[in-house]
A protein has these predicted regions:
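Cytoplasmic helix-loop-helix junction between adjacent transmembrane helices
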Residues: 120-130, 134, 141-168
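Hydrophobic transmembrane alpha-helices of multi-pass small-molecule transporters
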Residues: 58-61, 174-178, 204-208, 278-282
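Alpha-helical transmembrane segments of multi-pass membrane transporters/permeases
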Residues: 98, 153-179, 190-197, 287
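Residue-level signature of transmembrane alpha-helical cores of multipass secondary-active transporters
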Residues: 15-23, 57, 98, 137, ...
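Helix-terminus/linker motif at the lipid-water interface of multi-pass membrane proteins
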Residues: 28-47, 117-124, 180-187, 241, ...
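Small-residue-rich hydrophobic transmembrane alpha-helices
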Residues: 46-107, 144-163, 269-291
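Transmembrane alpha-helical core residues of multi-pass small-molecule transporters
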Residues: 53-56, 101, 169-174, 195-203, ...
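Short alpha-helical transmembrane segments in multi-pass integral membrane proteins
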Residues: 1-19, 74-142, 184-238
Length: 291
């Protein structure tokens, strides 16, 4: 697969299918989470997941910031004859940025989950359910950021199929695990969180196999002027980051207003709408990421 000399339509179609498949399964298993928890806990469970929704916007946006920003520059440098050979410096800086951001996000979720979820719209009735869902997720929280970053770099390292396989494998486990943990094991909303946490670990492990494959050209190297390169990455990825963060801010505003004036039952109706809008947003992302 020659990105410089290959025909545009077949190349784009291959990357579009990979990106669209990843986006679709990510959205579908969020919808399944909502459906399973709603069946088990009723409106309170669906409302609790609506409160958690902005958490995903934040962690995914941080992953896209370094993933999209770094992988775009990675491809540009690889395609430039004058600058070929420096692309892995951007991969290294993106990986360092991902570690720093994940540590900050992880510390925030571990130490301040109660005030964060309260700010996102949880009241005293929804807070225990939201925290119960987040309990297993907190321990693997950085993996959600790394999965976004790795998927972006794998697509630009001529392995979009593995990026899709990683997301699909984690997503399929999540769907099956939801039913098993929530109903068969009678774990309720905690089981949905556990399935999501294990699914993210599976996705991460599958994508890591790229680094032992013959297709891999990604290397950790000593970067020159890392701060400058990190600034380039954040500037390039900022537009994608901002779209996701803006969606999260909008969700928080809706959550708070709905809880203030209408209550948890109304928020339970809004929860599935969030998932559908995320699905549409992910489909739009896939078109841009394929390009």
């Amino acid at each position: 697969m020659d990105l410089l000399k290959g025909k545009i339509k077949p190349l784009y179609a291959k990357y579009l299918l990979a990106a669209f498949g990843s986006a679709m399964i990510t959205s579908v298993y969020s919808i399944v989470d909502t459906a399973m928890v709603g069946q088990y806990h009723g409106p309170q469970g669906t409302a609790a997941l609506a409160v958690v929704a902005p958490v995903w916007n934040i962690i995914y946006s941080l992953g896209l910031l370094v993933g999209i920003g770094g992988s775009v520059i990675f491809s540009m440098k690889r395609g430039s004859e004058k600058e070929s050979g420096v692309e892995n410096q951007y991969f290294t800086v993106a990986a360092i940025g991902a570690v720093l951001l994940s540590v900050l996000a992880w510390a925030g979720v571990l130490c301040f989950d109660r005030p964060i979820l309260t700010f996102f719209g949880a009241d005293e009735a929804l807070l225990p359910l939201a925290r119960e869902y987040m309990r297993p997720i907190k321990y693997v929280f950085p993996l959600f950021l790394f999965n976004q970053m790795l998927a972006a770099f794998l697509r630009n390292d001529k392995n979009p199929g593995l990026a899709t396989l990683g997301v699909l494998s984690g997503g399929i486990f999540n769907v099956a695990g939801d039913y098993f943990f929530v109903f068969t094991c009678d774990m309720g909303i905690y089981g949905a969180g556990l399935a999501t946490a294990i699914g993210s670990g599976i996705s991460f492990l599958v994508m890591l196999t790229h680094f032992i494959s013959h297709k891999n050209t990604l290397r950790l190297v000593k970067p020159e002027r890392p701060v400058r390169k990190l600034r380039e990455i954040t500037v390039t990825g900022f537009s994608t980051f901002f779209i996701d963060v803006a969606m999260g801010i909008l969700t928080v505003l809706f959550n708070r207003q709905i809880m203030k004036y209408l209550g948890a039952d109304a928020l339970a109706i809004y929860g599935p709408i969030i998932q559908v809008s995320t699905f549409v947003q992910c489909c739009a992302y896939s078109v841009g990421q394929a390009a």
